[in-house]
Amino acid sequence: LLPFGGEADLYLVAARYKKQPRLFFVHGNSEGISWKAAPGMGLRATATGTLKLDSVHVDSDAMLGDDTFNYQAFIDLGQLHWCALAIGACQAALDYLIPYVNEREAFGEPISHRQSVAFMVANIGIEMESMRLMTWRATALAEMGKPFHRETYLAHVLCADKAMEIGTNAVQLLGGHGFTKEHPAERWYRDLRVLACVNSGLHL
């Protein structure tokens, strides 16, 4: 799936050139390009869809970089962007949950006084910090020009796994309100669930 593909004037397309993965700039009005909207359960604001290229020709200067271009590093940086998205959405969920569980009352007291609720919120904070630190470590190595593929993979797996869990728990903590449109938790759940599916998914 490609975000904002129907609105793009220029695409960055991965293809093989001389048996090596490379990136090419392709104009959106090139002959042979077609776009089909494919709305998903999450990330609806990005207007996702599928892009089809049928015998599309590009000029020789459309290729990004030279023979030293590090395709794997490019992919890894993209993974870190997805990690940052997950962390931001999880932080939004936590910021919403804390006042909710402190103000929402059941059986004469805030639901945050229940240990099961308090532990769940605390675990979200702990898991978020681990997601953030793993992503920062991989990003720092990348900025220093050091190998960062391993750290990126670890951050991606952690963020994809914990993002699903945090999204689910955010809905659960809101109870019956969690799956209504009156509260944003259901949207965060859908967006965070996508992260385990995109970019080859959680288990590949």
Model segments located where?
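Glycine-rich phosphate/pyrophosphate-binding beta-alpha loops
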Residues: L1-G5, L77-W82, R193-G201
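A short core secondary-structure module
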Residues: L1-I33
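Glycine-rich beta->alpha junctions and the first turn(s) of the following alpha-helix
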Residues: W35-E129, L195
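C-terminal helix-coil-helix/basic helical segment that borders enzyme active sites and/or dimer interfaces
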Residues: I98, N102-E109, G125-L158, V171-G176
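Residue-level recognition of alpha-helical structural elements
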Residues: P110-H113, V117, F148-E151, K181
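Amphipathic alpha-helical coiled-coil segments
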Residues: K162-A170
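Glycine-rich phosphate/cofactor-binding loops in nucleotide/flavin-utilizing enzymes
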Residues: L174-L204
